[in-house]
Amino acid sequence: KEAWLMTADGETQLSVTLSYPEGDTRHKITSQEVSFYFYNGSNIFTDNNKELITDIEHIVGSYTTDNTTNTATVTLTAPKYYFYTTNAYYQYYVVIKAHFENGGSASVAKSIGISRPGVIILHGLNDSSETFQPMKEYLVDSGQFISSQILTKDYSATNTSSFYANTHQYQVVKIGLYELSNNLLNVGIASTKYDMIGHSMGGILERLYNQEVDNQHTNKIITLNTPHFGAPLGNVAPALFWYINTFANASPAYL
């Protein structure tokens, strides 16, 4: 599926090309100009009610241009951070104006969207994805996300297995990210990096995925009540064993 939006992660790219058939001597391209606009209308070329975007870095991201005698291409790289905090995505127009060898010119405009990074949410031990369904529904109802931008991944069938098994054998996070990227692409969003939220064991699995499998596709990680340094009950055990041994060896007079 062709994407027209990209997630704000500083890496995802889309290309727009104005092209003519090879051998078309009337339209030999010598150079091009690129501009960006906010516009909500039917004809950007004749309508003066458009806003030129000057803050390229934060709204558009970055871009490079390339042209041959029959093509003019702009490659866009998404901004590193999401510019709008209240919408699921925003859009702008990129306008390519190609100049021809014969002195003429032609322009094309393409709508491009910038989306929030997709979010994968992992539940904890002895739990299921149903725990975070109300949270997902709240975020979607707020208008800040669309449903495809959030995946509440369920791994209840394996979450009593070891961290290693869930990371490497069952590939909980890896498969979840694949599902999330497909969900995004199905609604026209190209993506490279993703936000991860994990509760308890879910946070550990996301951290282990980054440490042991792949850390090139993570935008940010947020963990909730995750025992990264082990469960606190582990600190109680040595003292508990000491008391048990002490009382077991104590003289009956002290019991």
Residue ranges and their predicted role:
Residues 115-194, 239:
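Active-site catalytic motif of lipid deacylating hydrolases and related acyltransferases
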Residues 14-16, 120, 204:
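Hydrophobic beta-strand residues of extracellular immunoglobulin-like
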Residues 149-152, 206, 229:
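Short, well-structured secondary-structure segments
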Residues 197-202, 206, 225:
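Gly/Ala-rich beta-loop-alpha elbow adjacent to hydrolase catalytic centers
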Residues 133, 206-211:
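Short, hydrophobic alpha-helix immediately C-terminal to the catalytic nucleophile
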Residues 174, 178, 191, 210-255:
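Helical cap/lid subdomain of alpha/beta-hydrolase-fold lipid enzymes
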Residues 187-190, 201-205, 213-214:
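Extracytoplasmic/secreted proteins and extracellular or luminal domains
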Residues 1-114:
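Beta-strand-enriched, solvent-exposed domains that form extended recognition/catalytic surfaces
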